[in-house]
């Protein structure tokens, strides 16, 4: 799975990066985000989300060319790539129904072929 070298849209510094790999899952239920990574479950309140960005690469079509990064506060970010089975449901059917996602930025990111960061949500924006 493609990893991003620098995550410009998420604050730099000592952060915990939780990566949702192919065998893992990411869901939203009852205002809580559930990240199942390996045998570990991470749970975050929806209220803790500071920012959500879409990251694009210039590596398509052989690698995932878009990823979602969710800043859940406490120096923790969750990452999921666009080809993951949970990506579309999480973004459009779950988180997109409860937060004010900037869908114009989602469209721009979807058509981008460069390395770029698109902020699609910021708390109190």
Mark where each language-model region is:
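Acidic, Ser/Thr- and proline-rich intrinsically disordered linker/docking segments
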Residues: 50-125
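Phosphoinositide-binding peripheral membrane targeting modules
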Residues: 18-20, 25, 29-57
